[in-house]
Amino acid sequence: SYGSRTMSNTYSMTCAQCYDETTWSFSKKADAVVLTLGTNDNVEVDKGKITYAQMKDGFKSFLLQIRTKNPSAKIVWAYGAMGNGAKDCILSVLKELGGEANGYYYVGLEYNGDGGVGHPSVAANSKNAETLAQALKKIL
């Protein structure tokens, strides 16, 4: 999260990054919603800016918000491309929400910090994209 511009309070906007607060209609129904969140949240825990419990509550609240807007979509959390610090928290929340039986899935990505500032390289992103694509084929 970055100050007041969190995913939870900008999810319903068309382009919060552009400060366009026009509400998204959600009229088109998604088959899947894929998240790749958690790295920066875990850094905030490590820095002592938020607690593990706050991170977990935030994850759960956001997933429930997504579910409200996408009641029949598979919700897929793809994580690990920049480390696995929040993995246990993510898995715990997905389990609490009923896991795959309730349409919540986890896809582990491979860590590779060969890109800029610890980000994955182009090759790693390509490999993780293939991992996610294969997982979505199975899930959908």
Residue ranges and their predicted role:
Residues 1-53, 81-88, 119:
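Conserved SGNH/GDSL esterase-like catalytic core that processes O-acyl groups on lipids
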Residues 38, 64-71, 95, 133-140:
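Sec-exported extracytoplasmic/periplasmic mature domains
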Residues 31-36, 74-79, 103-108:
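Structural recognition of the beta-strand scaffold that forms the well-ordered cores
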Residues 26, 77-78, 82, 99-101, ...:
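Conserved catalytic region of serine esterases and O-acyltransferases that act on ester linkages
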Residues 116-140:
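Histidine-centered active-site loop/cap adjacent to the catalytic His
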Residues 59-63, 90-91:
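Generic structural signal for well-ordered alpha-helices
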Residues 55, 59, 125:
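Aromatic/hydrophobic pocket-lining residues that form the small-molecule binding cavity
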Residues 105-117:
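Short helix/strand-capping connector loops at secondary-structure junctions
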